[in-house]
């Protein structure tokens, strides 16, 4: 378990590793759906509010999982979604997605 996750386990989950791992697994399952939603939103380039909500949710989940080194990217994505600069939004999304794939061992094609 990465150090950042150990910190979250201790500080937010009271060292309950079963609870933390169950939460982490559920989040990883949801990330696949989040990736699909983000891809659809980027193609449509219409729903800034939905992209902002997605980024906000990811920011919170990443913080809760202990990945405070990645969550600022989700926050930047949330702010960019409010401006709807779609090329910058796509750039930030691809960066965040790549960091999440690496951090959680996700399938890069999902």
Regions inferred by a protein language model and the residue ranges of each:
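Two-component system phosphorelay core
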Residues: 1-110
């Amino acid at each position: 378990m990465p150090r950042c996750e150990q910190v979250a386990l201790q500080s937010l989950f009271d060292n309950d590793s079963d609870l933390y791992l169950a939460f982490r697994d559920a989040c990883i399952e949801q990330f696949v759906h989040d990736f699909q939603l983000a891809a659809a939103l980027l193609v449509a380039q219409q729903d800034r509010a939905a992209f902002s909500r997605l980024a906000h949710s990811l920011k919170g989940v990443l913080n809760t999982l202990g990945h405070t080194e990645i969550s600022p990217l989700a926050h930047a994505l949330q702010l960019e979604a409010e401006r709807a600069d779609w090329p910058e939004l796509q750039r930030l999304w691809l960066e965040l997605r790549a960091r999440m794939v690496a951090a959680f061992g996700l399938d890069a094609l999902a």
